[in-house]
Protein backbone atom coordinates (compact mmCIF):
# COMPACT_ATOMS: atom_id res chain seq x y z
CA UNK A 1 0.00 0.00 0.00
CA UNK A 2 1.56 3.25 -1.12
CA UNK A 3 0.67 6.14 1.16
CA UNK A 4 -1.05 4.52 4.12
CA UNK A 5 -0.62 6.89 7.08
CA UNK A 6 1.75 5.33 9.58
CA UNK A 7 -0.28 6.74 12.48
CA UNK A 8 -3.23 4.51 11.62
CA UNK A 9 -1.57 1.29 12.73
CA UNK A 10 -4.26 -0.13 15.01
CA UNK A 11 -5.12 -3.73 15.72
CA UNK A 12 -8.82 -3.24 16.36
CA UNK A 13 -10.95 -4.58 13.54
CA UNK A 14 -12.52 -1.28 12.70
CA UNK A 15 -11.28 1.58 14.86
CA UNK A 16 -8.74 4.08 13.54
CA UNK A 17 -6.95 6.36 15.95
CA UNK A 18 -4.40 9.08 15.53
CA UNK A 19 -1.92 7.98 18.16
CA UNK A 20 1.79 7.77 17.51
CA UNK A 21 2.38 4.11 16.49
CA UNK A 22 5.86 4.05 17.97
CA UNK A 23 4.60 4.87 21.45
CA UNK A 24 1.05 3.65 22.01
CA UNK A 25 -1.92 1.69 20.74
CA UNK A 26 -1.66 -1.27 18.44
CA UNK A 27 2.00 -0.69 17.64
CA UNK A 28 2.83 -2.29 20.98
CA UNK A 29 1.53 -5.63 19.77
CA UNK A 30 1.09 -5.33 15.99
CA UNK A 31 4.26 -5.08 13.91
CA UNK A 32 2.85 -3.53 10.75
CA UNK A 33 6.11 -3.39 8.81
CA UNK A 34 6.89 -7.06 9.49
CA UNK A 35 3.34 -8.02 8.53
CA UNK A 36 3.68 -6.19 5.21
CA UNK A 37 7.08 -7.78 4.56
CA UNK A 38 5.65 -11.25 5.22
CA UNK A 39 2.71 -10.62 2.90
CA UNK A 40 5.08 -9.45 0.17
CA UNK A 41 7.17 -12.57 0.69
CA UNK A 42 4.09 -14.76 0.36
CA UNK A 43 3.09 -12.96 -2.84
CA UNK A 44 6.55 -13.52 -4.30
CA UNK A 45 6.47 -17.17 -3.23
CA UNK A 46 3.59 -18.01 -5.53
CA UNK A 47 0.00 -17.40 -6.48
CA UNK A 48 -1.39 -20.10 -4.18
CA UNK A 49 -1.43 -17.82 -1.15
CA UNK A 50 -4.23 -15.78 0.45
CA UNK A 51 -4.67 -12.25 -0.86
CA UNK A 52 -5.44 -10.24 2.25
CA UNK A 53 -5.48 -6.76 3.72
CA UNK A 54 -4.05 -5.85 7.11
CA UNK A 55 -6.06 -4.20 9.89
CA UNK A 56 -4.66 -0.67 9.30
CA UNK A 57 -5.49 -0.92 5.60
CA UNK A 58 -9.07 -1.96 6.30
CA UNK A 59 -9.45 0.87 8.82
CA UNK A 60 -8.35 3.42 6.22
CA UNK A 61 -10.65 1.88 3.59
CA UNK A 62 -13.64 2.01 5.94
CA UNK A 63 -12.90 5.64 6.77
CA UNK A 64 -13.49 6.48 3.09
CA UNK A 65 -17.11 5.22 3.15
CA UNK A 66 -19.46 8.05 4.22
CA UNK A 67 -22.63 6.01 3.63
CA UNK A 68 -23.30 4.22 6.93
CA UNK A 69 -25.18 1.31 5.35
CA UNK A 70 -22.39 0.61 2.87
CA UNK A 71 -19.74 0.98 5.54
CA UNK A 72 -21.57 -1.44 7.83
CA UNK A 73 -21.70 -3.98 5.00
CA UNK A 74 -17.92 -3.88 4.48
CA UNK A 75 -17.47 -3.81 8.26
CA UNK A 76 -19.55 -7.00 8.52
CA UNK A 77 -17.44 -8.78 5.90
CA UNK A 78 -14.30 -7.86 7.83
CA UNK A 79 -15.59 -8.63 11.32
CA UNK A 80 -17.22 -11.97 10.53
CA UNK A 81 -15.26 -13.49 7.65
CA UNK A 82 -18.58 -14.40 6.07
CA UNK A 83 -19.06 -15.39 2.46
CA UNK A 84 -20.98 -12.87 0.37
CA UNK A 85 -24.01 -15.17 0.15
CA UNK A 86 -23.93 -15.47 3.97
CA UNK A 87 -23.68 -11.72 4.62
CA UNK A 88 -26.33 -10.41 2.23
CA UNK A 89 -29.28 -12.32 3.80
CA UNK A 90 -28.40 -11.27 7.37
CA UNK A 91 -31.25 -9.81 9.39
CA UNK A 92 -31.37 -7.92 12.66
CA UNK A 93 -32.39 -11.09 14.52
CA UNK A 94 -29.28 -12.90 13.26
CA UNK A 95 -27.20 -10.58 15.47
CA UNK A 96 -27.40 -11.64 19.12
CA UNK A 97 -26.21 -8.58 21.03
CA UNK A 98 -28.41 -8.70 24.14
CA UNK A 99 -29.53 -11.32 26.63
CA UNK A 100 -32.93 -12.57 25.39
CA UNK A 101 -34.26 -12.81 28.97
CA UNK A 102 -32.94 -9.65 30.63
CA UNK A 103 -32.21 -7.45 27.63
CA UNK A 104 -28.78 -6.64 29.07
CA UNK A 105 -25.90 -6.29 26.59
CA UNK A 106 -23.99 -9.54 26.18
CA UNK A 107 -20.31 -9.54 27.07
CA UNK A 108 -19.76 -11.88 24.12
CA UNK A 109 -22.16 -10.88 21.34
CA UNK A 110 -22.26 -12.97 18.19
CA UNK A 111 -23.88 -13.36 14.79
CA UNK A 112 -25.49 -16.53 13.45
CA UNK A 113 -24.19 -17.30 9.97
CA UNK A 114 -25.92 -19.63 7.52
CA UNK A 115 -24.54 -20.94 4.26
CA UNK A 116 -26.65 -20.86 1.13
CA UNK A 117 -27.31 -24.60 1.53
CA UNK A 118 -28.42 -24.17 5.15
CA UNK A 119 -30.85 -21.40 4.22
CA UNK A 120 -32.33 -23.50 1.43
CA UNK A 121 -32.80 -26.45 3.78
CA UNK A 122 -34.51 -24.26 6.38
CA UNK A 123 -36.75 -22.69 3.74
CA UNK A 124 -37.69 -26.14 2.41
CA UNK A 125 -38.63 -27.24 5.93
CA UNK A 126 -40.77 -24.11 6.45
CA UNK A 127 -42.48 -24.62 3.09
CA UNK A 128 -43.45 -28.17 4.00
CA UNK A 129 -44.82 -27.07 7.36
CA UNK A 130 -46.95 -24.45 5.60
CA UNK A 131 -48.41 -27.10 3.29
CA UNK A 132 -52.09 -27.93 3.58
CA UNK A 133 -53.61 -31.29 4.34
CA UNK A 134 -52.13 -34.46 5.69
CA UNK A 135 -48.65 -35.12 4.23
CA UNK A 136 -48.15 -38.31 2.26
CA UNK A 137 -45.72 -40.97 3.41
CA UNK A 138 -43.23 -39.74 0.81
CA UNK A 139 -43.58 -36.16 2.04
CA UNK A 140 -43.07 -37.26 5.65
CA UNK A 141 -39.91 -39.11 4.64
CA UNK A 142 -38.64 -36.07 2.73
CA UNK A 143 -39.31 -33.89 5.77
CA UNK A 144 -37.38 -36.24 8.07
CA UNK A 145 -34.46 -36.24 5.64
CA UNK A 146 -34.47 -32.44 5.47
CA UNK A 147 -34.54 -32.13 9.27
CA UNK A 148 -31.67 -34.62 9.55
CA UNK A 149 -29.65 -32.57 7.06
CA UNK A 150 -30.33 -29.41 9.05
CA UNK A 151 -29.09 -31.14 12.23
CA UNK A 152 -25.96 -32.32 10.41
CA UNK A 153 -25.33 -28.84 8.96
CA UNK A 154 -26.09 -26.39 11.77
CA UNK A 155 -25.44 -22.65 11.36
CA UNK A 156 -22.32 -21.29 13.00
CA UNK A 157 -22.00 -18.58 15.62
CA UNK A 158 -19.25 -16.05 14.99
CA UNK A 159 -18.27 -13.89 18.00
CA UNK A 160 -18.23 -10.14 17.48
CA UNK A 161 -15.07 -9.17 19.31
CA UNK A 162 -14.81 -5.55 18.19
CA UNK A 163 -16.83 -3.20 20.47
CA UNK A 164 -16.74 -0.48 17.81
CA UNK A 165 -18.48 -2.70 15.27
CA UNK A 166 -21.10 -3.80 17.81
CA UNK A 167 -21.82 -0.16 18.65
CA UNK A 168 -22.24 0.71 14.97
CA UNK A 169 -24.65 -2.20 14.60
CA UNK A 170 -26.73 -0.91 17.51
CA UNK A 171 -26.77 2.61 16.08
CA UNK A 172 -27.81 1.36 12.64
CA UNK A 173 -30.61 -0.78 14.08
CA UNK A 174 -32.02 2.33 15.76
CA UNK A 175 -31.45 4.64 12.79
CA UNK A 176 -32.88 2.29 10.16
CA UNK A 177 -35.77 1.08 12.32
CA UNK A 178 -35.76 -2.29 10.58
CA UNK A 179 -38.09 -5.11 11.65
CA UNK A 180 -36.27 -8.05 13.24
CA UNK A 181 -36.77 -10.24 10.17
CA UNK A 182 -35.82 -7.62 7.56
CA UNK A 183 -32.52 -7.85 5.74
CA UNK A 184 -29.92 -5.27 6.69
CA UNK A 185 -28.91 -4.86 3.07
CA UNK A 186 -31.93 -5.32 0.84
CA UNK A 187 -30.10 -5.43 -2.47
CA UNK A 188 -30.91 -7.69 -5.38
CA UNK A 189 -27.52 -8.26 -6.96
CA UNK A 190 -24.15 -9.36 -5.61
CA UNK A 191 -22.65 -6.97 -8.16
CA UNK A 192 -24.12 -4.08 -6.18
CA UNK A 193 -22.27 -5.27 -3.08
CA UNK A 194 -19.04 -5.55 -5.05
CA UNK A 195 -19.52 -2.05 -6.44
CA UNK A 196 -19.74 -0.64 -2.90
CA UNK A 197 -16.26 -2.00 -2.21
CA UNK A 198 -14.98 -0.62 -5.51
CA UNK A 199 -16.37 2.81 -4.60
CA UNK A 200 -14.50 2.72 -1.29
CA UNK A 201 -11.24 1.76 -3.02
CA UNK A 202 -11.74 4.56 -5.55
CA UNK A 203 -12.39 7.08 -2.76
CA UNK A 204 -9.17 6.01 -1.04
CA UNK A 205 -7.27 6.35 -4.32
CA UNK A 206 -8.49 9.93 -4.70
CA UNK A 207 -6.85 10.62 -1.32
CA UNK A 208 -3.61 9.04 -2.51
CA UNK A 209 -4.10 5.72 -0.70
CA UNK A 210 -3.62 2.63 -2.85
CA UNK A 211 -3.66 -1.07 -2.00
CA UNK A 212 -1.27 -3.73 -3.21
CA UNK A 213 -4.14 -6.25 -3.28
CA UNK A 214 -6.12 -5.75 -6.48
CA UNK A 215 -8.96 -6.06 -6.94
CA UNK A 216 -10.38 -5.78 -3.43
CA UNK A 217 -13.41 -8.08 -3.36
CA UNK A 218 -15.72 -9.63 -0.73
CA UNK A 219 -13.39 -12.66 -0.73
CA UNK A 220 -10.52 -10.33 0.19
CA UNK A 221 -12.21 -9.52 3.49
CA UNK A 222 -12.91 -13.18 4.23
CA UNK A 223 -9.22 -13.96 3.69
CA UNK A 224 -8.25 -10.88 5.72
CA UNK A 225 -10.45 -12.01 8.63
CA UNK A 226 -8.78 -15.42 8.66
CA UNK A 227 -5.27 -13.96 8.44
CA UNK A 228 -6.09 -11.47 11.22
CA UNK A 229 -6.94 -14.43 13.46
CA UNK A 230 -3.79 -16.30 12.44
CA UNK A 231 -1.69 -13.22 13.19
CA UNK A 232 -3.12 -13.19 16.70
CA UNK A 233 -2.34 -16.89 17.24
CA UNK A 234 -5.95 -18.07 17.36
CA UNK A 235 -5.82 -21.90 17.25
CA UNK A 236 -6.31 -23.39 13.81
CA UNK A 237 -9.29 -25.49 14.95
CA UNK A 238 -11.06 -22.36 16.18
CA UNK A 239 -10.38 -20.57 12.90
CA UNK A 240 -11.76 -23.58 11.02
CA UNK A 241 -14.99 -23.36 13.03
CA UNK A 242 -15.36 -19.60 12.59
CA UNK A 243 -14.73 -19.85 8.85
CA UNK A 244 -17.20 -22.70 8.43
CA UNK A 245 -14.61 -25.00 6.87
CA UNK A 246 -15.53 -28.68 6.82
CA UNK A 247 -12.03 -29.65 5.73
CA UNK A 248 -9.05 -28.59 7.86
CA UNK A 249 -7.00 -28.26 4.67
CA UNK A 250 -9.03 -25.18 3.77
CA UNK A 251 -7.86 -23.54 7.00
CA UNK A 252 -4.26 -24.69 6.60
CA UNK A 253 -4.14 -22.55 3.46
CA UNK A 254 -4.00 -19.49 5.73
CA UNK A 255 -1.46 -20.82 8.22
CA UNK A 256 0.86 -21.74 5.36
CA UNK A 257 1.84 -18.08 5.01
CA UNK A 258 3.39 -18.05 8.47
CA UNK A 259 5.48 -21.12 7.73
CA UNK A 260 7.61 -18.73 5.66
CA UNK A 261 8.37 -16.73 8.79
CA UNK A 262 8.56 -19.40 11.49
CA UNK A 263 12.34 -19.70 11.66
CA UNK A 264 12.70 -15.95 12.19
CA UNK A 265 10.02 -15.92 14.88
CA UNK A 266 11.54 -18.84 16.77
CA UNK A 267 15.13 -17.77 16.25
CA UNK A 268 16.07 -21.08 14.59
CA UNK A 269 19.69 -21.21 13.36
CA UNK A 270 21.48 -24.02 11.52
CA UNK A 271 25.06 -22.74 11.57
CA UNK A 272 27.46 -23.15 14.47
CA UNK A 273 30.95 -21.94 15.16
CA UNK A 274 33.37 -24.82 14.30
CA UNK A 275 35.50 -24.15 17.38
CA UNK A 276 32.50 -24.34 19.69
CA UNK A 277 31.30 -27.46 17.90
CA UNK A 278 34.70 -29.13 18.28
CA UNK A 279 34.72 -28.45 22.00
CA UNK A 280 31.42 -30.30 22.29
CA UNK A 281 32.53 -33.28 20.23
CA UNK A 282 36.17 -33.82 21.23
CA UNK A 283 37.04 -35.50 24.54
CA UNK A 284 38.26 -33.17 27.24
Describe each model-derived feature in a short phrase.
Residues 133, 137-144, 154-212:
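Active-site/catalytic core of tyrosine-dependent DNA strand-transfer enzymes
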Residues 50, 65-66, 76, 210, ...:
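Residue-level marker of regulatory loop/turn positions in helix-turn-helix DNA-binding domains and
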Residues 89-171, 259:
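Conserved tyrosine-mediated DNA breakage-rejoining catalytic core shared by Y-recombinases
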Residues 190-194, 211-232:
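Short basic/aromatic active-site micro-motif
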Residues 105, 243, 247-268:
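Catalytic-site neighborhood detector that most strongly recognizes the C-terminal catalytic loop/helix
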Residues 75, 220-246:
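C-terminal catalytic core of tyrosine-transesterase DNA break-rejoin enzymes
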Residues 55-84:
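Basic, Lys/Arg- and aromatic-enriched nucleic-acid-binding interface segment
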Amino acid sequence: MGTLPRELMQISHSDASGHNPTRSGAARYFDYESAVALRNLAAAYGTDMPRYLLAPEVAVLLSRVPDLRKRLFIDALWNTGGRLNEILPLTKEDFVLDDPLTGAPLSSPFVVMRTLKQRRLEEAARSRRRGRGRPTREEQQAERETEAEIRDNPPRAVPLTDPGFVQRLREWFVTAGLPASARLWDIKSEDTARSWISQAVAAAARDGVTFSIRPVTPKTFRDSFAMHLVQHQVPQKVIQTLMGHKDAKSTEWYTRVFALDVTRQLGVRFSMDPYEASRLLLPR
